[in-house]
Amino acid sequence: MLCGVPQGSVLGPLLFIIYINDIVNCSNLDAVLFADDAALVLHHKTFKQLQKQLNVEATKLNKWFITNKLTLNLKKTKVMVFHKRRNKKHIVKKFRLNINRVNIEQVNHIKYLGVILDNKLNWQKHIDYISTKLNRTAGIIFKLRKQVPSKVLLLIYNSLGSSYLRYALMAWGTVRNTALRKLQTLQNKIIRYMTHSPLMTNVTQIKKRSRL
């Protein structure tokens, strides 16, 4: 390799983290780093000043990349505005972020480290994402339930379904009860499939009987 870090190497991740460690000092943005993923956060009282300062800080960030002979992936770089006001149309129309003469796309939601963040912070997109995973898991378990024992089905559920429910729960778990009920309904369906129980069977009783 002439540049970069070999994928799968033992020292690669550590060397990369050391190399980019001072990125947090190149601007006044609050940085959240994980491996080669970064979220940069800036807040301000007024929208106008927010846009102005963010463009200034983005220029500093771009200079850091040039100095360190790195390239910022502008296609994967997005900007999202969190705002208290319900009417956000003026933000979508007026907000502009430019890096190296490229306009950065503004989005209403984005997936970061496995969690879908939305600009309203109602977590609806993430709930839908988990629901899709649970539905897929339910389909797999339904097809296999007559061919494999319940212990294997439970292992499949923990790997393909339950892991999504537990992941980052401290963040999105504050959603409304209506959203949680949607997930609970899907989970109950899977539990009934795993234990070969009729669809109207009380799930609480199933859990006690099966020690789930």
Segments from the language model and where they lie:
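Short, conserved non-catalytic motifs in the polymerase core
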Residues: 1-15, 41-47, 97-101, 120, ...
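Active-site palm subdomain of RNA-directed nucleic acid polymerases
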Residues: 13-42
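Catalytic palm subdomain of template-directed nucleic-acid polymerases
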Residues: 39-63, 122
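Hydrophobic packing residues in well-ordered alpha-helices of helical domains and bundles
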Residues: 51-54, 58, 72, 127, ...
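Short, conserved micro-motifs composed of acidic
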Residues: 56, 71-108
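Charged boundary/loop elements
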Residues: 67, 75, 167-178, 184
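Basic, alpha-helical interaction scaffolds
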Residues: 101-171
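Short linear motifs embedded in intrinsically disordered, charge-biased segments
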Residues: 178-212
